[in-house]
Each structure stands twice: as C-alpha cells, then as structure tokens.
C-alpha cells in the first residue's frame, strides 16, 4: 500500500479508473462464495468498508443484482461516477456515507459529490458528517452505522 506500508489496498490508489474494475470481479466472486458457503442470499448481506474498502463497497454493491441489504462507507468515495449513473439498474440498496470534515486523505467534499450522483439515481442516502474527524472512524460514526444496519436488516 503506497500510503501506509502496513496497510492493505484493493487497487493502486493512483489508478482510480482501471483499479476498481480489476478488483470488482475478485470481490464479487468472494461475496458469492461466502454467501453460498453460509447458505445466505443478498438480503442478509451488508457491505461495510473504510477508505478504499468503502469505495469498493459502493462500487460493487451498487452494481449487484439482487442488491445487498445495505452499504456503509466510512471515509470513502464514489468512483467511476459517469459509468454508474449511466446504469439503469434498480433497485439500489440504501447507502450510508460517514465522513470526517477534516479528512485530508479522502476529502469530505467527495461525500457531498457522491450524494449528488446517488440521490438522482433513486438511491436512498443517509449521510453522517463527523465534525473535526480526519481519515478515520470514531465511536459516534460507528454507532450511527450500527443503527443504520439494524434498521435495514430488520426488513
């Protein structure tokens, strides 16, 4: 991982076009295998990720048919927006975007941009702004995600 030598990444962060598309089939196959191994279907699946993991949750989860029960992205971003908005796939899962206002790695404005793309597509989007938080997850954001997931897994 370029940013953190002890970190992990799904794709080279400098390749935000080809990287997600190359990682997508690997992730989709992993999800399918795990669902099958545990005898579950997509309505029991939630995708939750941080940073690049959040980016890939959005990338894959919004393209899944049937969709997962919900997606939560902490400090992530919506990649390949033009390609996604050209899709006419419905239904979409509900999405929660949680982001710190002081994030220097994945700027807060990217959450606002994602909302501007997703809502016109008919995606139900819940946003959680974390004032003063940098690139991370705090207890209030974690609590918000747990409430969001509980609400959408009860359906």
Give, region by region, the residue ranges found by the protein language model.
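Serine-hydrolase catalytic machinery in alpha/beta-hydrolase-like enzymes
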Residues: 1-44
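Flexible "cap/lid" loop of the alpha/beta hydrolase fold
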Residues: 5-14, 76-95
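Short beta-strand immediately N-terminal to the catalytic nucleophile in serine-hydrolase-like folds
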Residues: 47-49, 74, 98
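Gly/Ala-rich beta-loop-alpha elbow adjacent to hydrolase catalytic centers
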Residues: 48-53, 57
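Hydrolases whose catalytic domains are alpha/beta-hydrolase-1, hotdog thioesterase
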Residues: 56-60, 82
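A conserved short beta-strand
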Residues: 66-79
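Short beta-strand/loop motif that positions the catalytic acidic residue
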Residues: 96-99, 103
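C-terminal catalytic histidine-bearing segment of alpha/beta-hydrolase fold enzymes
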Residues: 109-155
């Amino acid at each position: 991982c370029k940013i953190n030598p002890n970190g992990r990444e799904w794709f080279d962060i400098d390749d935000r076009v080809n990287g997600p598309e190359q990682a997508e089939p690997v992730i989709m196959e992993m999800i399918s295998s795990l669902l099958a191994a545990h005898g579950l279907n997509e309505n029991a699946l939630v995708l939750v990720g941080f940073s690049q993991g959040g980016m890939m949750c959005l990338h894959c989860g919004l393209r899944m048919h049937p969709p997962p029960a919900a997606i939560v992205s902490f400090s992530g971003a919506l990649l390949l927006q033009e390609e996604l908005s050209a899709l006419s796939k419905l239904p979409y899962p509900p999405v929660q975007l949680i982001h710190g206002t002081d994030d220097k790695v994945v700027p807060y404005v990217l959450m606002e941009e994602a909302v501007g793309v997703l809502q016109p597509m008919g995606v139900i989007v819940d946003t959680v702004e974390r004032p003063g938080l940098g690139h991370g997850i705090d207890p209030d954001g974690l609590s918000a995600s747990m409430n969001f997931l509980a609400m959408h897994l009860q359906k």
